[in-house]
């Protein structure tokens, strides 16, 4: 199931094409994805990256999409992988208290926010690297949503004559997609920043968006946002290709809640979602953790 099919199925099951409902389908889908990804570990949640440590620098920045560590290895000068053991910060500080305690790192700890970006994380290594070793991290992250054509970036034409303020949750108009809203900052009577609340769906690069003057203080003109990139132009994902019932019933549960539907319908779709999740869990934490050689073939007991 791709996003176009999922988008239509949600409308068909919910029997609604009301514009506000349709504009929020991408939100229903993203909420379902978040529930799935935080419940079952599946292959599409893992990513592998390599980087380089800085000699005499005990800190390592985590990838911007990092959620948690699967493994962290330092590659020695002869190509040998040395997998680091996860410890807490106190252990590393106590074991290697001096800046001169250098060598091939053996341990790592999730340290906290980076100095340059409070929203991103960093690791503490012990001992401090004595050379610029290559490091390989296998980690969990949120894969790209199945939502097709969500806004990613663009170029602002600020316009003139607007009332200075921060305008929240402003609907964006125009383009080939729908449903996008943003916080728009106006300074010096011109638009200076656009921060998405809802990235919408079905936009394409080259779309030119704007916003109603009525939503921007009632005065001013000529603000434009030219889309330069969107997310997932094909509207596909591993979940959509392999376990679409999880996405469908998860999104429908959110849709019924949005519609203020009857509690029994919420419970119905929740049950359907949980049944689908049992199948996915069988794969993610069952079949993929073993094989027939090690665990034997699955079979049922037959009475003689």
Model-derived features: positions:
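Conserved, function-critical positions that sit in or immediately flank catalytic
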Residues: 148-231
